[in-house]
């Protein structure tokens, strides 16, 4: 159960119970539990001597009522002893997670340029459209922000940068004045186990790569002259490609630009998403036709080199756990291919793979690039998750 649930479960009538009092109550209950507590939760609870649990000004009946309030949010398929220990852990974690940000001196979180514009104009637009849902008003405001002149946008951006600098200075002073509060909460054991497994798998893959012979072209891919460039695989990738070079996003860092593009994708209507999807599908069809025609222009030697390069890439992807790319088999000796190849003299056509090939680092990405539907729209840079992921089963290449 999340730590915040315990606090929510406490009504106003029991507000005089501090976290320290709740911990004391749970400790008293723990001390009065039977040593071999193997009974059900309800059975052990019914035999609890609440008179022995009472402490300070809290009577046994008050302790019993308080425990009933706390246990409302706890799972019941366990022994009473385990539930008491679980409740203690939740109360302690509540103290750790909230004592920093709930501190009166902690600086106020920043608002991005868009969120600042949103808050300033929300009252006006909510009155203009009283019968409209909040989500629809948000879409209108988002559209208005996009239509703002560049000069007005720059004003919001400059205000944000100025406040960001002030926030960082205040945060640095806060950490100096309260070093005991500047401690990151420990992750749960489950997160640590998952992280350890991932790290072990990554380390294993790295060791396998390092053990390959020096001649292995694992991180190299031959770029053949005239080879068609792969288009976006889906609607979101097409939208991302179009938005990446937008002038209004150039002032953002790479990470912020990725996050903003993901947010914009969530705000556009479904009809526009379908439009991008159709564009991506059309580009994929054109790419397949161009690739097929290009393969027919290759000499038998170049076709074999291209096939070997693609096969090596698929083998390496499979070793890293990714899907192997498919290569449509085109017979270079077909009638159409022969007609195109007759004009090739010795030394013409494509040069050897090693002569003009530029080295490319291939990064295999297994997760979907599409942002989650339930992504938060709070606009806080520091707490944005999103990260931008790579397309499913595809590669991103960076020329070096």
From Swiss-Prot:
Instruction: Give start-end positions of Polar residues composition bias.
Output: 327-338, 356-367
**GO cellular component term, pick one:** nucleus
> Does the record bear Disulfide bond in its keywords?
no
The GO molecular function terms of this record are: RNA polymerase I core promoter sequence-specific DNA binding; RNA polymerase I general transcription initiation factor activity
Q: Keyword Nucleus, does the record have it?
A: yes
- CDD domains recorded: HMG-box_UBF1_rpt1-like (cd21998), HMG-box_UBF1_rpt6-like (cd22003)
Chief location of this protein within or outside the cell: nucleus
DNA-binding region in chain numbering: 107-175, 229-295
List, alphabetically, the InterPro entries matched. Answer: HMG_box_dom, HMG_box_dom_sf, UBF1
Mind telling me which SUPFAM superfamilies this protein's record contains?
Answer: HMG-box
User: Pfam families this protein is in?
Assistant: HMG_box
Q: Which UniProt keywords apply?
A: DNA-binding, Nucleus, Repeat
Q: Name one GO biological process term.
A: transcription by RNA polymerase I
| Highest taxon of source | Eukaryota
Give its localization. Answer: Nucleus
TM region(s), chain numbering: none
Region annotation Disordered: residue ranges? Answer: 320-400
Q: Which PANTHER family match?
A: UPSTREAM BINDING TRANSCRIPTION FACTOR, UPSTREAM-BINDING FACTOR 1-LIKE PROTEIN 1-RELATED
> Which protein is depicted?
Putative upstream-binding factor 1-like protein 6
